[in-house]
Amino acid sequence: MQTVLKDAEDRMKKALAALDKEFSRLRTGRATTSLLDGVRVDYYGTATQLDQLASVATPDSRTITIQPWDRKAFADIEKAILKSGLGLTPVNDGKIIRISIPPLTEDRRKDLVKVAKKYVEEAKVAMRNVRRDANELLKKKKNDKAISEDDQRKGQDDVQKLTDNYIVKTDEAFSKKEKEIMEI
């Protein structure tokens, strides 16, 4: 029974980690290097992650700088950022690419909160699926006479407590992200 709980907890942790990763990609008006995590650059015919072609830094809260290691990559990096759909405009001065992060409009902030809410719902669904799988496994063990009915009921209660705990953590992460997005 403990293995079922441990497995369920590991899977819920992964769902929460995936939510945090999605949240880190949401633009909040502050410059972070994680904004560019999903950007792939077509470099000599291969889709390459930006951080493998250049050093990415945030000198202040409104600017991201990209310093490519290969001068030939400047145009490819600019093109990839423009195509990424992030709404960012790179400025190339020949040595470094600068991206200024404009302040978000009220409408854009509300849209980002909706996107964050969608990510939260996806994480909650994933956690509920983990709960369902764990409960089915406990039921199967009871039917196979590996555990008693009392143990099954206790296991299901423990899985429910675990699920409730992780859903609270998910809601807390959303509240924090919502506050960050709506902050001017």
From Swiss-Prot:
The family database entries (SUPFAM superfamilies) matched by this protein are listed as: Ribosome recycling factor, RRF
GO-annotated cellular components: cytosol
Extract one GO molecular function annotation from the record.
ribosomal large subunit binding
CDD domains per record: RRF (cd00520)
- Region: Disordered; residue ranges are 141-161
Q: What is one process in the GO biological process aspect for this record?
A: cytoplasmic translational termination
Is Oxidoreductase among this UniProt entry's keywords? no
Main site of residence?
cytoplasm
Q: Which UniProt keywords apply?
A: Cytoplasm, Protein biosynthesis
Localization per Swiss-Prot or TrEMBL: Cytoplasm
Q: Where would one find the signal peptide in this protein? A: none
Annotated Gene3D superfamilies: 3.30.1360.40, Ribosome-recycling factor (1.10.132.20)
Function statement: Responsible for the release of ribosomes from messenger RNA at the termination of protein biosynthesis. May increase the efficiency of translation by recycling ribosomes from one round of translation to another.
Q: Which PANTHER family match?
A: MITOCHONDRIAL RIBOSOME RECYCLING FACTOR PSEUDO 1, RIBOSOME RECYCLING FACTOR
The UniProt entry, under HAMAP family, shows: RRF
The text of the family note is:
Belongs to the RRF family.
Q: What is this protein called?
A: Ribosome-recycling factor
Q: Which organism is it from?
A: Solidesulfovibrio magneticus (strain ATCC 700980 / DSM 13731 / RS-1) (Desulfovibrio magneticus)
